[in-house]
């Protein structure tokens, strides 16, 4: 049983991409799918996965362009396409039905999957993710216009600092009552992947 609790670091070929995922727990246990968000990867769940593995069969993927999954240049980086890559991974691994934990980008990705396969969803935990356009408050209007309505290098420029060290660090520390409890490994890992050629463009896409 102890071996089943160890986190496995695996890859699967999906649509010609090497898709990385973390997996732990007894395959006979209830399944729990962890879908994270910007700017991280399954690395954000590195402590949660082993804490759940004694009760759940846990899986968490890196999306294309994130973490250890391939980042092809010729790829449609949309929530719909990302959801279909994750869906194909779940089919390949037989990982369904499941409980779904989704955070940030995990919301529009996970909700698309369960909309296509409602029988796969047993329960869900929602943390800071959005299901509807109405969930975007007026504070998002400038970003939505810059990227979705009138996208140019000029409209992108004010958003680029969010992909630099201080911006990525802010994702983890903003509003936290004790930032010294947050390991810098988090944003340093994200920055490692963001510094790949073309990675910032992928995130803006």
Give the label of every model feature segment.
Residues 50, 61-64:
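N-terminal cap/lid subdomain of alpha/beta-hydrolase-fold enzymes
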């Amino acid at each position: 049983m102890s071996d089943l609790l160890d986190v496995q670091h695996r890859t699967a070929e999906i649509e010609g991409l090497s898709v990385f995922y973390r997996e732990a727990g007894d395959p006979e246990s209830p399944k729990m799918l962890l879908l994270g968000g910007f700017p991280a990867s399954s690395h954000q769940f590195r402590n949660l996965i082993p804490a759940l593995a004694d009760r759940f069969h846990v899986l968490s993927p890196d999306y294309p362009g994130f973490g250890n999954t391939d980042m092809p240049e010729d790829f449609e980086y949309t929530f719909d396409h990302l959801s279909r890559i994750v869906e194909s991974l779940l089919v390949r691994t037989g990982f369904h039905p499941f409980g779904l934990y989704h955070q940030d980008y995990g919301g529009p990705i996970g909700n698309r999957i369960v909309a296509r396969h409602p029988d796969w969803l047993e329960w869900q935990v929602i943390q800071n993710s959005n299901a509807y356009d109405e969930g975007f408050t007026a504070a998002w209007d400038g970003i939505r216009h810059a990227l979705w309505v009138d996208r140019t290098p000029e409209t992108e420029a004010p958003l680029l600092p969010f992909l630099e060290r201080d911006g990525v660090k802010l994702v983890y520390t903003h509003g936290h009552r004790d930032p010294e409890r947050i390991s810098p490994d988090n944003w340093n890992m994200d920055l490692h992947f963001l510094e790949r050629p073309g990675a910032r463009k992928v995130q803006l896409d």
